[in-house]
A protein has these predicted regions:
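Radical SAM enzyme [4Fe-4S]-AdoMet core and its adjacent flexible, acidic
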Residues: 1-104
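Flexible mid-to-C-terminal extensions adjoining Fe-S/redox cofactors in radical SAM and related proteins
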Residues: 77-168
């Protein structure tokens, strides 16, 4: 699997390849020796351009993240608080906690109203496209986990949903 870089510092923004890179030319698959067995390797490349097709593998594959402290988050991107840079713009991501397995069962958290509503919203991807918005330069929402449609958290400019950054 090959993935793009998620810049955490301003100096890393110049190291991204998406939206400006020439297509990578590598074989889609190859034979790999495995003792007496012949294995077949498959290359899984990320998308290199921002586009309208967005989907969340965590929601589609009914996955979640349980932190070291028992807190349940819907995905890696929302599992902790951190800054990152997308297309040169700083974004502060706040951890999105949907429950704690020390207080409730995983089944209760998964079927809770907030989590069900969040998954439905992500499944239909009802978020604006912040990256290519004409107001993006003067919008305060895009600097945080929010968007102008009132979503908090917002997956509007999630690089994982774009398949620019891939999960293992």
């Amino acid at each position: 699997m090959i993935s793009n870089l998620l810049p955490y510092r301003p100096e890393q923004t110049g190291q991204t390849l998406y939206d400006r890179a020439e297509p990578v030319s590598i074989p889609a698959s190859w034979a790999v020796g495995g003792g007496s067995w012949l294995l077949w390797g498959i290359t899984k490349l990320p998308r290199m351009k921002w586009g309208a097709q967005r989907r969340c593998r965590f929601v589609d594959e009914e996955s979640l993240v349980i932190g070291w402290d028992g807190v349940v988050s819907p995905c890696y991107a929302l599992a902790h608080t951190y800054p990152y840079y997308t297309y040169g713009r700083r974004k502060e991501v706040e951890r999105y906690a949907l429950g704690d397995v020390r207080d409730k069962s995983l089944s209760e958290i998964w079927s809770g109203e907030e989590y069900v509503r969040f998954r439905a919203k992500v499944r239909h991807f009802r978020f604006p496209s912040c990256v290519d918005c004409a107001l993006e330069g003067g919008c305060d929402f895009a600097a945080h986990n929010q968007d102008c449609w009132g979503n908090d958290p917002s997956c509007a400019d999630c690089l994982w949903a774009q398949n620019i950054i891939q999960c293992p």
